[in-house]
Each structure stands twice: as C-alpha cells, then as structure tokens.
Curated annotation (Swiss-Prot):
Disulfide bonds: C108-C186
InterPro entries per record: GPCR_opsins, GPCR_Rhodpsn, GPCR_Rhodpsn_7TM, Opsin, Retinal_BS, XYPPX
Protein name: Rhodopsin
Top-level taxon in the UniProt lineage: Eukaryota
PTMs per UniProt: Contains one covalently linked retinal chromophore. Upon light absorption, the covalently bound 11-cis-retinal is converted to all-trans-retinal. After hydrolysis of the Schiff base and release of the covalently bound all-trans-retinal, active rhodopsin is regenerated by binding of a fresh molecule of 11-cis-retinal.
Family: Belongs to the G-protein coupled receptor 1 family. Opsin subfamily.
Protein location: Cell projection, Rhabdomere membrane
Extent of motif 'Ionic lock' involved in activated form stabilization: 132-134
Length: 452
C-alpha cells in the first residue's frame, strides 16, 4: 500500500506536489507519528523564537554587551530565530497535523531556501565564533588578531554571502528543493542520483559541512591544549608568585576548566545536530537507497531543527553578564536554568580581577582572565630570558685547562714498590695526657696578658 497523498483533488489551495517516487514506495506513516512530530516541532519553534528573541533583545539593548565578539552571538541568534520561525512553527507543524505538505510547490522551494540559508548560516557563524575564541585564548598577545567591530562586520557579511551561495543553487537548477521524510517539510534533494544533484550534495558536504567542522575542531582542540599547557606552566611558576598573582592564577585555572567543558559541549552539540543529516545525504547518494526510509530521513531533521534551541543556551546563557541581564529583565527564564552560586561568584571574581579597560575587546570574563594570566606568564618568561646566562656563553674558554705535556708523567713513574711498605711509621706508645700545649706569646707581649 502506497502513501495516501492527495495530489489531483480540488482544494482551496493547490495540494499538488512534485514527490520523488522513492517516498511513494513506503507505507503511510501512522497518524501518531505525524502528531508527535508536529508537537515536537511546535515546542522547538516556540522555544527557539522566544530564546533567540530574548538574546537579540538583550544584546542590542545592553551597551556593555555590544562588543565585537558578541556580534557573532547576535547573528547566530537572528539566524536561529528565523530558522525556528519559518522552518519550524507554524508551517511544518500545520503540515504534520494535516499529515502532508499543504502549502504547494512554490512555498516548498521558499521553505527549503530559507532553511538552507539560515541553517548554513548557523554553522558558519559557529565557525567564526570558534576562530574568534581561538585568537583570544590561543593567541592572546597577537595584536593583529584583536577583534574590532569592522572586522566582525566583514566576517558576518562573508557568512551571509557564503551561506546564500550554497543555498541558492537549487533555485537555479543545481539540485532541487523537494519534500523529504514524512513529506511534511522541504529540503535539498539528496535522493536523485544524477550528476547535477550529486555534485551539489558533494560540494555542500565538503564546503558547507566538512570545512566548518575541521575549523571548529582545530580551534577548540588548540584552545583546550593551550589552556592545558599554560596550566602546567603556571603550576611550575606558582612558588614565585605573590598573593595577587596567585589569586589571578587560581581564577585562570577555573576559567581553563570552564572553557574546556564549553569547548567539548560545543563540538558535541555541533556533531549531534548536523552529522546525522550529512550521513543520510551521503547514504542516499552512495549507499543502499532502501536504507533511507521516511523515519531515517526525518530523524536527522529533528536534530537539526533542535539546534536552534541549543545555541542560545551554550553561547549566550553561559555569559555571566548576559545572565545578569536576564535576571533583571526576565527572571522567569532562569527558573528552569538554575546555576550554582559558587559558579556565579567565580564569574564575578574573574571579572573583578580584570580592569574595565581590558574587557572592551569583546571577550568574556573567562577569556579575558585567561588572556591576563597568559600575559603575566609571558612577562615572567621574558624577565627570565633577559637575565644573563650562567655560566656565560663561551666559558670556560676553548682549550682550558691545557692538556698535560706529552710524556708526562714519565713512563714507570712512580717506581715499583714506592712508597716502601710501613712508611711512614706509626707513632709508638699511648697518646699524651693533659691539655694540648699552648702557643708561646709573641715577642714583647706579657704572658699573663696574652693568656687573658
């Protein structure tokens, strides 16, 4: 039994859709699956719109948060907000409850285009965030790597252009946008095995997925290695630090652990969100096509759409200043995201240790604390290098000490049997009794005065 899909009936809208024959060979998905997907997408869409909307509002209204690095957070929130609004609730939710796509071919292409642009934009924005954090933490003393509003704006423009280039191809015939999975949402056509579609899928896989993931892995791996190496160096220098420097070092160690954890969470979240989708697309092109069932195709869609919820939590709510603004403007949001009091105090201590002028570069308190700690370590290392080496270079001089003269000592020296046995002779008799004899006074000095 094929899937019950209306195509030639007369409705107040045109339900006719171009559906790939691959999907028609499967039995109809149970109604409970459609309703479950509709509820899930509605929840993701509402939370994604509210969460990312709050991020955009607070970052644009709070002057202290309008830093170059936070421009990437705003762009990511805008991308996820649009992704949740268009590709989640209400279009896909309505289609799931109707059990088929109800908006026609033109809307399918627009839906797929918007999902492609803002989905790829989220990936590329996360890549730019990883590059910025690598420059701040992994190479903090490089003046040329300092982020500015102009540089951040140029990088964001590049993200928009890059995402649009790869997403707009199917509109002009390089691939296509079509229904997928349970036929309630549209995306790239990864089922058709012709040269055009295959080249489109491969190029997107390499340049829009693998390249960003390699950059993200490289940046966060080097961040973890950098903070680990500096922690070891700081432990070796701990004995030479005063109380203030030691307090900064301890705060930096806390920042290291937090940054390492966040790095692992970011990479894991990225892989869970987008890797299943990439695997299904490659499997459909180069693997057994029968493995790409409606369920196998729809599950990665759910992971990808849920990423719009994860991103504001990871990139924004972990920001201490952002949490303060949430607590003052939207305290009800934090009721579901309680934080350990010690963690909040550590964040405040980290910020208190850093002068206000040093936080204007856009980095978070953790990144700024790490930057100051590494600057202090590099200063100490430079002082060590300025001290003269001991012993000085070139000492002792070459050829010193001089070699002994040739033929010295003479052959056969000392003579055999020398010194003679029993020489020198041991003293005879018991040791002398009484105190040791006293030295005579110098000439012209009274003996009694000398003894006194």
């Amino acid at each position: 039994m094929g899937r019950d899909i209306p195509d030639n009936e007369t409705w107040w809208y045109n339900p006719y859709m171009d559906i790939h024959p691959h999907w028609k060979q499967f039995d109809q998905v149970p109604a409970a699956v459609y309703y479950s997907l509709g509820i899930f997408i509605a929840i993701c869409g509402i939370i994604g719109c509210v969460g990312n909307g709050v991020v955009i509002y607070l970052f644009t209204k709070t002057k202290s948060l309008q830093t170059p690095a936070n421009m990437f957070i705003i762009n990511l929130a805008f991308s996820d907000f649009t992704f949740s609004l268009v590709n989640g609730f209400p279009l896909m939710t309505i289609s799931c409850f109707m059990k088929y796509w109800v908006f026609g071919n033109a809307a399918c292409k627009v839906y797929g285009l918007i999902g492609g642009i803002f989905g790829l934009m989220s990936i590329m924005t996360m890549t730019m965030i990883s590059i910025d954090r690598y420059n701040v933490i992994g190479r903090p003393m490089s003046a040329s790597k300092k982020m500015s509003h102009r540089k951040a704006f140029i990088m964001i423009i590049f993200v928009w252009i890059w995402s649009t280039i790869w997403a707009i191809g199917p509109i002009f015939g390089w691939g296509a946008y079509t229904l997928e999975g349970v036929l309630c949402n549209c995306s790239f056509d990864y089922i058709t095995r012709d040269t055009t579609t295959r080249s489109n899928i491969l190029c997107m896989y390499i340049f829009a997925f693998m390249c960003p993931i390699v950059v993200i892995f490289f940046c966060y791996f080097n961040i973890v290695m950098s903070v680990s190496n500096h922690e070891k160096e700081m432990a070796a220098m701990a004995k030479r630090l005063n109380a203030k420097e030691l307090r900064k070092a301890q705060a930096g160690a806390n920042a290291e652990m937090k940054l390492a954890k966040i790095s692992i969470v970011i990479v894991t979240q990225f892989l869970l969100s987008w890797s299943p989708y990439a695997v299904v697309a490659l499997l459909a092109q180069f693997g057994p096509i029968e493995w790409v069932t409606p369920y196998a195709a729809q599950l990665p869609v759910m992971f990808a759409k849920a990423s719009a919820i994860h991103n504001p939590m990871i990139y924004s709510v972990s920001h201490p200043k952002f949490r303060e603004r949430i607590a003052s403007n939207f305290p009800w949001i934090l009721t579901c995201c309680q934080y350990d009091e010690k963690e909040i105090e550590d964040d405040k201590d980290a910020e208190a240790e850093i002068p206000a002028g040093e936080q204007s570069g856009g980095e978070t308190a953790d990144a700024a604390q790490m930057k100051e700690m590494m600057a202090m370590m590099q200063k100490m290392q430079a002082q060590q290098q300025q001290q003269p080496a001991y012993p000085p270079q070139g000492y002792p001089p070459q050829g010193y000490p001089p070699p002994p003269p040739q033929g010295y000592p003479p052959q056969g020296y000392p003579p055999q049997g020398y010194p003679p046995q029993g020489y020198p002779p041991p003293p005879q008799g018991p040791p002398p009794q009484g105190p040791p004899p006293q030295a005579a006074p110098p000439q012209g000095v009274d003996n009694q005065a000398y003894q006194a």
